[in-house]
Amino acid sequence: MDSLFVPIASFVDKYPLSDKERIAGTGDMSGSVQNTVGGWRLSSDIGCVFIGMEGLIHSYQYVPSEQSKALIEKLIALFERMDLVGIKAQTHASLTAMRGMLRYAALTGDTTLIPKVETRWKLYKEFGMTENYENYNWFGRYDTWTEPCAIIDSYLVATQLWAVTRNPQYLEDADKIYLNGIAATQRANGGFGCDRPVGVVSPDLAIHADEATWCCTMRGGEGLGRAAEYAYFVEADTVYVPFYHESTLALPDRNIALSQHTGYPFGNRVEFIVTEAPKRAVTLALAVPSYLRPDSVQLPSHSDVSAHFVQGFLRVSGHFDAGDTVALNYGFEPRWVPLENRDIADKTLYKAMYGPLVLGYEADAPLELAGKEFSIVADGPDAFRIEGTEFRLTPLYHLLDPAVSSGANYHRMVTVKMDTATVCLE
């Protein structure tokens, strides 16, 4: 900290916040030095100083000092002054700054930082996120590439925002990022690579780089580890299940253990078997996002276990016994969703979704449909078609599919142009 961060303290107020002081449109996947302004050697990864800021905040957690605290707060104030869209900040750097602010809020109790992160998160969703919930590498540079480092950041920020606000919208954001963005960028060898971003410029998902071994594969590993960590949250006597995964949970200090069985986002059931239960009443809170249709709930036969919906969760409460089963049977509806980036002026562009999953299709050019209503029909758990056409839809989600590679010339069309009068949104 003394040699890396302390020397920059006197330069923070000189940090160039104007896009006119930058060389526009430069940078490759690993970044490059642009020019020097006010003592700062500027990177094409605009705002990358905030990646360092998050590391400084992490170190402050273990080695606190007044010097570190003062510098952290100067850097946070600098980030708050930066016009992310105007300066075309790197989205990875911006999201890492948000993670740092959330960590600092937890360390210091300064909850005023949380709504500031929420504002920046909204900006990212509007101008920095692709139509399959990856990222544009920079705000406003829509013809570049995506970066799993930032996609992982976005998953962490969304989940952490839910943890501190309990706003269920953030869980929906995280679910879609994990199943579409993170899953789409993991390659057959387990590494992570960059894609061509779907949305403002490109109508299709394609490979930009098979693997970014120098950064994204490492961050991808962290993302998968965090997905396991985020499978369950515990607060007092409530076990939250914000995301569904085949998994087990053991809390020896609370005398709680259970196993979870599901094919989510495929299939139609998530089941929990209690293998150890305390003598006190506890609550199992199961996520019910807005795109999930809760068809039925299976509860233990004894009468003191009840279920009710609260703030995006099905809360199952009562005294459980070892061997009890709780299950949620669910369904999804295929639907057309308007493209979400605010810089997309054409309001006749849509994407197909099934629950949290973005669907794509094989074609050389984006579809243009007009003249009648075009519904999406499910032919199976991962097979769909646009009624009245020959076009088949499949999820962009995949699990280590070797076909997702530049060598296989992988690409999937996502956007569809339709007369709004012919769109069946549900």
Predicted regions and their residues:
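Long, well-ordered core segments of solenoidal/helical folds
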Residues: 1-20, 66-87, 112-133, 175-188
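Surface-exposed loops/turns
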Residues: 278, 321-322
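Short, surface-exposed beta-strand/beta-hairpin micro-motifs centered on an aromatic residue
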Residues: 313-315
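Short beta-strand segments within Ig-like beta-sandwich modules, predominantly Fibronectin type-III
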Residues: 304-310
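Extended ligand-binding groove/face enriched in aromatic
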Residues: 1-77
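C-terminal beta-rich recognition modules with glycine/proline-rich loops and embedded aromatic residues
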Residues: 117, 171-273, 309, 318, ...
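Aromatic (Trp/Tyr) and acidic
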Residues: 32-64, 91-123, 138-288, 296
